[in-house]
Amino acid sequence: MGQKIHPTGFRLAVTRDWNSRWFASSGDYSRMLHEDLKVRDFLKKRLAHASVGRVVIERPAKNARITLFSARPGVVIGKKGEDIELLKRELQKIMGVPVHVNIEEVRKPEVDAKLIADSIAQQLEKRIMFRRAMKRAMQNAMRLGAQGIKIMSAGRLNGAEIARTEWYREGRVPLHTLRADIDYGVSEAKTTYGIIGIKVWVYKGEMLGRNERPAVVENENEARRGRRAPRNDAGDNRGAKRPARRTGAEQAGAGDKAGTRTRKAGVDDAAAVEKEVS
């Protein structure tokens, strides 16, 4: 069901793409998979304060290309590019192949689910009330174009003895609609009372699948003209008054007059025939 399954995995090959894009034989698959996991864990610790939302790993022809989606690319690059060069060398030691690092800037971090979850986790670690942090994040997301957002926090909230789960939602979040563009992110806040988990769902609107085409929306005026019945006459009769509807008595009187005219025409025809015979 859409309520239970991972939103990204549910939409793979429909509206979402994989975060690791490479092909390997059966012998190399497990090794490369473990390398990817090590790289992601390393980047998570190394770039914890760089607001990295997503990491995409590609392996073209005995090389590796890593794309970092960050809201603070200057922190990743460092002064005169020193930090990113050091990062490349460390990644090459882990993967064993030449590594190219690309950085993509996240223009609106307020509507990125992973960055929202990380922001709430940092606030909880600073002893900010969880309700205030969640509602502030929801307001910022809705203000910057999100059509819906849902945030869930679980653990010893506010240092309570018994762990519980609380969630808030604003707008609509259709988890079971495959064409819905839903961004999902998870983060953990390490507090003095224990770990608090944060999950965020952000609904950004509907998007087309890979093989779908946009529906053709015709002009409203043309659609209205197409539904209008054709006119009987070819001339332009705009502004002309329509004949008023006749009542039942008027219609009966018109029928009597028509019958009288028919009988009179018959008498005239008979008189003309007699005159010709004589």
Swiss-Prot record:
Q: Which residues does the annotated region (Disordered) include?
A: 217-278
Q: Which domain of life is it from?
A: Bacteria
**SUPFAM superfamilies, per this entry?**
Prokaryotic type KH domain (KH-domain type II), Ribosomal protein S3 C-terminal domain
In the record, biological process GO terms are: translation
Whichever gene encodes this chain, its name is rpsC
State how it assembles. Answer: Part of the 30S ribosomal subunit. Forms a tight complex with proteins S10 and S14.
Keywords assigned by UniProt, alphabetized: Ribonucleoprotein, Ribosomal protein, RNA-binding, rRNA-binding
Q: Which GO terms describe its cellular component?
A: cytosolic small ribosomal subunit
Function comment? Binds the lower part of the 30S subunit head. Binds mRNA in the 70S ribosome, positioning it for translation.
Protein's UniProt keywords contain Metal-binding: no
KH type-2 domain mapped to chain residues: 39-107
Where are the compositionally biased (Basic and acidic residues) regions?
A: 230-239
Q: Which NCBIfam families match?
A: rpsC_bact (TIGR01009)
What family is this protein classified in?
Belongs to the universal ribosomal protein uS3 family.
Q: What is the protein's name according to its record?
A: Small ribosomal subunit protein uS3
Write down the Pfam families for this protein, in alphabetical order. KH_2 (PF07650), Ribosomal_S3_C (PF00189)
Q: Does the keyword Ubl conjugation apply?
A: no
Tell me, what is one Gene Ontology molecular-function annotation carried by this entry? rRNA binding
Q: Which InterPro entries match?
A: KH_dom, KH_dom-like_a/b, KH_dom_type_2, KH_sf_prok-type, Ribosomal_S3_C_sf, Ribosomal_uS3_bac-typ, Ribosomal_uS3_C, Ribosomal_uS3_CS
